[in-house]
Amino acid sequence: MKTIIAYHAVTERPLLPGQVILMDAEHQNGVGRRVAEKLPLVERIYRNPAAYRADGLEHHTAVTLRELAMEEVRRAKYPQYPSRMACLYVSRTLEEAEKWADFFARIGRPTYAVVKLEITGRCFIGDAERCFPGSPDRVENIRLAEKYWAYPQNGSGNAAVCEMLADGEIRVLETVKEINANL
């Protein structure tokens, strides 16, 4: 495992310097927890997709449909990458993390700070614009998930909105910027 430095826009709960976060199959993130809560509904949707309209799905239900497709494709074709349901979403640069923090604060999400991290684990840099609203059409969800994971890993940073997924041992090195919005 290689060690890298990255940054994170802290939402949901504060992170403190020296704190260690473990992200792996046994330690899911908020996405993973929300997906688990929606599994019974997803099973009903996939048993009878004609009874549901994509534009009528509640936000977290659409996200769950997307994330389950993302995980299915990752496990089958890209197991070397972190799971979106057991990772920390981080940024390669302070500037990227500040943009995410500003975005989260603007949409009303509790946003505490931007922190600098030391990550010993796996990373995947993807194009956040390739995230899609999940739909009752499982085949289409899988097709779109394949496009997300196939994003070229050339490090050129050519994606308009990068998202970096990191798992493993993640240590908070310092708080770089206090935000404290929508708390």
Question: Which residues fall in each region the model found?
Answer:
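Conserved NAD+-utilizing ADP-ribose enzyme module
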Residues: 2-5, 11-62, 84-86, 95-113, ...
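Active-site-proximal specificity loops/subdomain of glycosyltransferases
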Residues: 59-77
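A short acidic-Thr-Gly-centered motif at the start of a beta-strand
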Residues: 79-81
